Amino acid sequence: SWETFNIFNKTFGDTRHLNPEALDRLDYFTSKLKENGIYVDLNLLVSRGFTGADGLPVEINAMDWKDQQVLGFFVDEVAELEKEYAKQLLTHRNPYTGLTYAKDPAVAFVEIVNEQGLIQGWLGGVIDDLPATFEEGLGIKWNEYLSLKYASDQKLAEAWDGEGEQSSQAELL
């Protein structure tokens, strides 16, 4: 498929090592864009397919790469992998410009996540189809949030009309 050759080095079986050839292509391409006055948009999470070899539960292997993107919003290990990659890429020195991507003024902006969000994942049914290990983790995070937001079960019930449905006065997010 179109994402087979990408920034991750497949020889390691994970997505934690960068592919030197792909990185060189990116470096050269961005240097040529810069030479021609064209700014760069770096995307940190586009078609990365996480695997169990990344240190994640093996259930990740059964998920579509696009659906995996929602996990970074509530699975701490995925968020850490995203930060690790961001640091690797943004602190890498482009040999053609002599600058890191973090310091290169030709990098106009960096997209943390491309075309995905927690609400989008929920509306698109991704949340409903999560493997149990990730669904349980989301449930734990949700309950922690509710515990912090509402001082008691009674306050929670009042805000959600005691029926599990949020009242018109309560905040959804």
Language-model features: locations:
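Active-site mouth of glycoside hydrolases
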Residues: 1-173
